[in-house]
Amino acid sequence: MSKTIYYACKYAPLELFAGYGATFSALDPLAESFSCAERCAHANLCGYAKAVLEQVEQSGIRALVLTNCCDAMLRVYDVLAASGKMEFLQLLPVPHQSTPATRARFARDLRRLADALQRYTGQEFDAQRAHAFFVHTPHAEGPHLTLLGAHGGSVLYDTVQKAFALPVVDATCTGNRELADVAPAALEDFLPGYAAALLGQMPCMRMDAPVSERAALVDGQTVGIVYHTVQFCDYYAPGLTAPEQFHLPVLKIETDCSRQTFTSGGGQLSTRLGAFAESLNAVPDTENKEAPAMNTNAQYAAGIDSGSASTDAVILDRSGKIC
């Protein structure tokens, strides 16, 4: 069984985990089936929530921090809490807005989580360890594609990237985590600024924020958008509201976070991505290689006999030999 603390939201306080010396990792669910999830939760739960339940069960995850990002994740918390299997299960309430009052409340909730982390890890908060985890990812330079929408995970990102010659920027709800730096300090002094930094990120769709605040997800170098939705998602499934403002080519795709999407259903997804790449003149070189030169002097004849139960064919070269 894994002792790693897992998380499923960009508002999860990773720097706080690091401050307590915890090992942590993002959930990246891709379910083989939903048999476990549908036994203990409703079948109409969104695919991502069901895939989270499957990963927790199949991987033996026993430490998990969730947020109240949507009703589906609240149900995931309820199911896991009722199972009695979790060693460390925390639900972090995340405000829908960033105001002085919500930031103060969020700091108090972070303090409660910090106390739980101290009990679980047996370590004191180390401000330098927390500060060392503030990492800023360099932004893509030059023309690129932007992957927007709901969580897609590593398999979806790789699938999209393989279809395009251009770099793909993951700006999905779990792919665009970036915090302003917070100076190292004692826990009580660290948490107010840290709460503000977490809530100051580019807002996801569940946050009460104007569309203009999300505009920075798509910069002037974006040539096209792949907008990902998950079946039954509360926030990203209803429609293409955000991407329409950018006046860029948009491809909308939907998955259910199952492996079947990329196997038996993967042909349709690949075909749509390939067609979109072709429309943007961004087909990878492996698909743009010139065909071998034809021998125009060669002459062949073909005969085809098609019946009700079978079809036979024969090809002869110019000397009459069967090829």
Predicted feature residues:
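Short glycine-aspartate micro-motif
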Residues: A301-D305
